[in-house]
């Protein structure tokens, strides 16, 4: 994109101020800013809804532990066959940094070992290898990174020889970024040559995969299901044959792993139905009545906490791309440079960040285990 093309695009969205410092930049800075303008989707600002009225929320049934144990052998056999046939891929959402862990590195690089080095990425691979060993077939792993941690993540895997995993079955892709804007819809500038952006939420992973050209690899491998999971949980089973088998056996469009809450007020989102379709209600949205509501067995009705571990059918995901997921905006503190080019770090929220949520993906599908 050249300068004139950038001006025209910015005029379309009333964002001409992005080029305010253009003449002060060196050639590299000008090139990078024009490139960012070209790839930035300014339409998200107009698309986004704040909160929005939820539909009718109701409890959802889940497969209980006794039911799982009863069908474990049968479900496990179905799941292993699907893995062995190459029909299952895994998607690791690893775009975050380890800031809350006291680290400036990608979260997956954090060392959780006590007597020896054990990295979060290492545990993910070790968990996945359990199923690989059982099935005799490598599972294609897609690792989602972000602009801030992509190079560090890729290099970390290389330096550790992919923790023993076949590198041909690991593909990296970057999460899309969304512009951050003030309350009037004007995007902030992080620097004179850089628009302020943030990751586009946990619902944007599949679109980011598509934009990265990974659909060809999915087709080549014959992958029909994708197990999506977050980097945070080092104890979770990945590509769990029993989970896969139960979803396939029931003919569901998506499966969600859940855990019973330790108490009604535990701060975790829960699976539910919304207007009769599967959905998720965040803990801040749960009313006192919902927190204390019980089912016919005397159990808490909204009791199935989500852990961000889902199994999606690929062909249904492709259908979602045609419908487009909504964007949601939330007020945040966004560092920026002012009209004088001075850096400002606000003490209070000063604008919106824009995200797509995985709950919208689930709600667009008709059935969930």
What do the PLM-derived regions correspond to, one by one?
Residues 97-101, 109, 143-144, 148-152, ...:
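Flexible loop/turn segments at secondary-structure boundaries
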């Amino acid at each position: 994109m050249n300068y004139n093309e950038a001006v025209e695009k910015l005029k379309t969205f009333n964002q001409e101020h992005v080029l305010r410092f253009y003449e002060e930049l060196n050639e590299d800075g000008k090139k990078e800013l024009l490139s960012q303008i070209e790839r930035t989707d300014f339409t998200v600002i107009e698309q986004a809804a704040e909160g929005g009225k939820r539909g009718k929320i109701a409890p959802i049934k889940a497969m209980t532990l006794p039911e799982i144990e009863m069908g474990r052998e049968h479900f496990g056999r179905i799941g292993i066959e699907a893995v062995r046939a190459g029909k299952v891929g895994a998607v690791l959402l690893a775009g975050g940094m380890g800031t809350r862990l006291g680290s400036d590195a990608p979260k997956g690089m954090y060392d959780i070992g006590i007597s020896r080095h054990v990295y979060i990425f290492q545990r993910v691979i070790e968990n996945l290898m359990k199923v690989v060993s059982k099935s005799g077939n490598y599972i294609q792993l897609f690792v989602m990174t972000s602009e801030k941690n992509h190079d560090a993540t890729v290099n970390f895997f290389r330096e550790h020889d992919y923790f023993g995993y076949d590198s041909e079955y690991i593909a990296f892709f970057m999460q899309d970024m969304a512009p951050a804007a003030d309350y009037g819809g004007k995007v902030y500038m992080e620097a004179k040559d850089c628009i302020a952006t943030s990751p586009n939420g946990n619902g944007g992973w599949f679109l980011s995969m598509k934009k990265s050209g990974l659909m060809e690899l999915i087709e080549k491998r014959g992958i029909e299901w994708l197990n999506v999971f977050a980097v945070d949980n080092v104890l979770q089973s990945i590509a769990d044959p029993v989970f896969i088998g139960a979803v396939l056996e029931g003919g569901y469009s998506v499966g969600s792993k859940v855990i019973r809450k330790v108490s009604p007020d535990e701060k975790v989102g829960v699976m539910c139905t919304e207007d009769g379709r599967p959905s998720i209600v965040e803990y801040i949205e749960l009313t006192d009545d919902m927190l204390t509501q019980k089912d016919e067995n005397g159990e808490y009705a909204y009791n199935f906490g989500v852990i961000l571990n889902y199994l999606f059918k690929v062909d249904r995901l492709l259908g979602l791309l045609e419908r487009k997921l909504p964007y949601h905006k939330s007020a945040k503190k966004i560092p920026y440079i002012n009209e004088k080019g001075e850096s400002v770090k606000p003490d209070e929220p000063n604008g919106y960040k824009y995200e797509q949520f995985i709950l919208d993906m689930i709600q667009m599908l008709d059935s969930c285990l």
